[in-house]
Each structure stands twice: as C-alpha cells, then as structure tokens.
C-alpha cells in the first residue's frame, strides 16, 4: 500500500495506484509541497482553532447551485472554496487577513471576493 496503510489492498476505500511512479509515504515525506504535507498542515491549522472543529456552527455567506465559490463563516474565520477550473467571484465583503491557503488563494476587491481556480482560503477576521 505504498506505506500509507497496513491493511489489505482489497479492504481499502480507494484502490492503490498501480503506476511505477505512484507516490509513496517515503517520497511524500521528503517533499514539503506534497499532498501528505498539505493535509497535515490543514489538519494542524484546524486543530489549533476551536471555531474550525467538527461541531462548530457556520453561516453560509455565498452559495449558488452548481456555481463556485462556496463561502461561509465559522466563528472568526471566513472560508472560501473554489474547486472549479475558473476564477470565481462572490459578492462577499471580507475584512481580515489571510490565515491559510491552498492553491492560488483569493483577492479581496471592495465588496467581492475573487477566488483563484482550484483554491481554498481562510481569512481570520
């Protein structure tokens, strides 16, 4: 299982990548920009802040069916997610500092938030 699990390949939720250049735990550990390190950073950030715990309340600030971005507030944080391949704009006013990002982040313009393609950003208010 390339070092990610000790379980049988048949019992895993997702199949093991069969390619010769498939990522291994060892290769991911050595690459600070790897998916493994990214997941560890975001989990550490989440655990540092009570507002981001699983039982935290949230308020949707912007959401449209089949349209990005999705923007919501949890306590003192505003979180914006854009999984699309295009820059997405939400009519949301954000006054805070960027606390965490994955991807290209976002840009605050007057009364809107422009989120880069395939990006995730957290602002601390």
Predicted regions and their residues:
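Loop/helix patches that line or flank the sugar-binding groove of alpha-linked glycan CAZymes
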Residues: 1-88
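Active-site donor-binding loop signature of nucleotide-sugar glycosyltransferases
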Residues: 2, 102, 125
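A broad, low-specificity signal marking well-ordered, structured residues that form hydrophobic/aromatic
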Residues: 36, 70, 96, 113, ...
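A structural detector for beta-sheet-dominated domains
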Residues: 61-63, 73, 93-95, 103, ...
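Assembly/interface hotspot detector across virion components, adhesins/toxins, and nucleic-acid enzymes
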Residues: 71, 106-108
């Amino acid at each position: 299982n390339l070092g990610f699990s000790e379980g049988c390949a048949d019992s895993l939720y997702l199949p093991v990548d069969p390619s010769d250049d498939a990522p291994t735990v060892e290769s991911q550990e050595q690459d600070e920009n790897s998916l493994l390190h990214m997941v560890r950073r975001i989990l550490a950030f989440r655990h540092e802040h009570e507002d981001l715990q699983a039982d935290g309340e949230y308020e949707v600030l912007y959401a449209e069916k089949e349209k990005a971005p999705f923007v919501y507030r949890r306590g003192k944080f505003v979180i914006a997610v854009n999984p699309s391949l295009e820059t997405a704009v939400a009519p949301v006013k954000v006054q805070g500092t960027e606390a965490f990002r994955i991807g290209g982040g976002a840009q605050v313009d007057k009364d809107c938030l422009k989120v880069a393609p395939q990006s995730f950003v957290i602002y601390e208010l």
